[in-house]
Curated annotation (Swiss-Prot):
NCBIfam families: rpsG_bact (TIGR01029). GO terms for molecular function: mRNA binding; rRNA binding; structural constituent of ribosome; tRNA binding. It comes from Leptospira interrogans serogroup Icterohaemorrhagiae serovar Lai (strain 56601). The lineage of its organism: Bacteria, Pseudomonadati, Spirochaetota, Spirochaetia, Leptospirales. GO terms for biological process: ribosomal small subunit assembly; translation. This is Small ribosomal subunit protein uS7. Keywords: Ribonucleoprotein, Ribosomal protein, RNA-binding, rRNA-binding, tRNA-binding. The gene is rpsG. GO terms for cellular component: cytosolic small ribosomal subunit; ribosome. Belongs to the universal ribosomal protein uS7 family. The keyword tRNA-binding applies. It holds the Pfam family Ribosomal_S7. It comes from the Bacteria. Coiled coil: none annotated. Part of the 30S ribosomal subunit. Contacts proteins S9 and S11.
Amino acid sequence: MSRRRGKVEPRKITPDPVYNDVQVAKFINCLMLSGKKSVAEQLFYDALEIIQKKTGNDPYTTFREALENAKPQVEVKSRRVGGVTYQVPVEVRPERRLALGIRWLIRYSRDRNEKGMAAKLAAEFIEAQKGTGSAIKKKEDIRKMAEANKAFSHYRW
């Protein structure tokens, strides 16, 4: 069912103060728990400092590449046709692509074994930049599932 009053305008997110980047601000907002934004900001910037110490590379570039590598191109959606549920591969919209990439990086960072959230984030960013890590594995699993169900792509809506 469509909306009566047209499209909803997306909220404007103010860029973060250090890198002046909206994607960094979104990442910090998703990292935040219980409204504690200053804690989330500190964790994020500490993680970037850890990346600087470990690799010697530009931490901001590492973050951007890690996020880009974690973004999925395709995903599968369930579609019920005649009593049978098919997993239909669909292309992911750019906004959702960013949201999923951020969500997966944070989720799999929290599951890691390093001491402290900043160290966990840093390790996940470094691995995601290299093309390894749990967030990248999740992306690849979904891509493989979409590839396996390519035969049902004509059921798109």
